[in-house]
Amino acid sequence: MMRTWANINGKLEFIGLCSARGEEWVDGGDGYMYSGNDVAELSCMSYHELRSIAEAEEVDFFPDDSLYGLAVRIAEQRAAKYGRQFFKQEKRSAV
């Protein structure tokens, strides 16, 4: 079980403990896993494509962002602007 946040009315809000089974989750490189329609779609693109999208949609990003980190930044902004599906979970550590 992991703590999970979801986009609710443009805000990322804690929704409880959930299992990630059967869903595609992307490691954002910040200790969290992310999921949602845009996350899945964007994480399949090249870094160059993501940089172009980030610039066009005026998403703040850093030159050293990973491909998945950049995909997450774009998806998170889309969720806030357009109410798109977006989930965030604490990353589980291996025992």
Regions found by a protein language model. Give the residues of each.
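A short beta-strand micro-motif
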Residues: 3-8
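Basic helix-extension-helix modules of the SAP/HeH family
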Residues: 17-95
